């Protein structure tokens, strides 16, 4: 865009008059006015070049507001893991893990573990957002995450730590239907949701009961 602008500047009436007069007197040095005008044109082209690069360079970090904007414009994607890639069991908050018998080779993941992993990963695009939030909210910052971000981070973490054929227990998840749906759309199908007796009639439990995926403890 800035390259196309140069010919238009050179064709302006002022520029044509100044340059045409000097072409007939090649032996005369350029006037200060001519040098100044050429310098201004060069500066304008340089500024346009920088603006163009800034607009087109890849986005490596997100602020809180930018994440909300991105999330609001996202369309449904292909999930990270295909159906049957994992044997995935989600364990809601309130279930005593000592009542569960984890297979020796099972991978046990907590959302807090995934979020902290990326808060401490300086080259991750969510590093700035998470640390800004941490500075404002302290240890309770996870409760203030933008809608949907916890699911995004859990998915990224599982992509790094899990592989096809793994048995995975995701603790303290999901807390609500919105996160459950987003997770199944973007990360992986959930094979079983383990809920405490106190939540047997909760919204998440009712949702997964329709597909016979609830186990109450």
UniProtKB/Swiss-Prot annotation:
The keyword Mitochondrion appears for this protein: yes
Subcellular compartments: Mitochondrion membrane
How does it sit in the bilayer? Single-pass membrane protein
Q: Which gene encodes it?
A: AIM36
Keywords of this protein's UniProt record, alphabetized? Membrane, Mitochondrion, Transit peptide, Transmembrane, Transmembrane helix
Per the UniProt record, which residue ranges are transmembrane?
Answer: 34-50
- Name the chain's protein: Altered inheritance of mitochondria protein 36, mitochondrial
* Cellular component terms per the entry's GO annotation: mitochondrial membrane
Q: Which family does it belong to?
A: Belongs to the AIM36 family.
Keyword Mitochondrion on entry:
yes
Q: Where is the transit peptide?
A: 1-26
- Per the UniProt entry, the disulfide pairs are none
């Amino acid at each position: 865009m800035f390259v196309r602008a140069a010919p238009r500047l050179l064709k302006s009436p002022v520029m044509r008059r100044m340059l045409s007069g000097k072409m007939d007197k090649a032996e005369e040095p350029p006037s200060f006015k001519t040098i100044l005008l050429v310098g201004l044109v060069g500066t304008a082209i340089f500024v346009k070049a920088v603006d163009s690069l800034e607009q087109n360079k890849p986005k490596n970090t997100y602020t809180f507001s930018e994440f909300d904007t991105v999330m609001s414009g996202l369309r449904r994607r292909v999930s990270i893991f295909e159906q049957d890639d994992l044997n995935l069991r989600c364990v809601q908050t309130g279930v005593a893990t000592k009542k569960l018998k984890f297979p020796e080779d099972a991978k046990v993941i907590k959302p807090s573990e995934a979020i902290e992993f990326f808060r401490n990963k300086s080259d991750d695009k969510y590093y700035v957002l998470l640390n800004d939030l941490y500075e404002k909210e302290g240890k309770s910052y996870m409760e203030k995450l933008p809608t949907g971000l916890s699911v995004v981070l859990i998915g990224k973490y599982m992509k790094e730590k899990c592989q096809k054929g793994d048995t995975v227990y995701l603790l303290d998840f999901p807390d609500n239907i919105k996160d459950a749906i987003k997770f199944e759309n973007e990360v992986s199908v959930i094979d079983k949701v383990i809920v405490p007796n106190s939540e047997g009639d909760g919204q998440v439990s009712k949702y997964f009961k329709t597909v016979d995926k609830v186990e109450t403890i």
